[in-house]
């Protein structure tokens, strides 16, 4: 029995305690610091950001990435976030966007009406104007006219996005 206890202590990786102590914010922050330093050594002028997701915000019972915008704001030039508004949840999606307001400009760098109607997406864009400095969406290299001619669902979705995008944020 004593040999078994000793063996289990020996086989337990020592790094587990270190990882448990460091996760998640310190590792995320150090990674961003190192990347920023490396970029700045070759390019002192380009803006630096990290793509954040809705689960970058700490919330009860929700997966958490460790890339907390409040912690990381000092390391980046602007906040960029991937947000896909969901049907009947536009208010919650705007509230999520508000969570990224940490004193830096916000760019919604990845968005698309993937999980909501065109009308809900337009509403999301309209209401996000008070928080976002810009928006970037998908473009797969096909024009609006090409997408309209196609009979593929993906092209219909892309056409809807391109129509909204070309009109501008309502």
Q: What residues fall within each predicted segment?
A:
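Extracellular glycoside hydrolase catalytic/binding regions
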Residues: 2-142, 147, 157
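Extended, alpha-helix-rich binding/interface surfaces that flank or overlap catalytic cores
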Residues: 143-170
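Accessible peptide chain termini
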Residues: 1-2, 170
């Amino acid at each position: 029995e004593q040999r078994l206890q000793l063996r289990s202590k020996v086989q337990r990786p020592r790094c587990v305690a270190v990882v448990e102590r460091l996760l998640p914010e310190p590792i995320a922050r150090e990674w961003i610091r190192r990347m920023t330093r490396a970029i700045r050594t070759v390019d002192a002028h380009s803006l630096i950001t990290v793509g954040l997701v809705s689960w970058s915000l700490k919330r009860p019972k929700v997966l958490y990435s460790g890339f907390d915008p409040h912690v990381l704001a000092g390391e980046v030039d602007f906040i960029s976030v991937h947000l896909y508004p969901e049907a009947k949840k536009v208010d919650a999606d705007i509230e999520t966007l508000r969570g990224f307001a940490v004193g830096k400009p916000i760019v919604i760098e990845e968005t698309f009406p993937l999980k909501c109607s065109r009308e809900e997406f337009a509403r999301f864009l309209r209401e996000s104007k008070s928080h976002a400095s810009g928006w970037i969406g998908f473009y797969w290299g096909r024009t609006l006219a090409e997408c309209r001619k196609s009979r593929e669902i993906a092209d219909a979705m892309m056409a809807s996005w391109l129509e909204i995008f070309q009109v501008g944020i309502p």
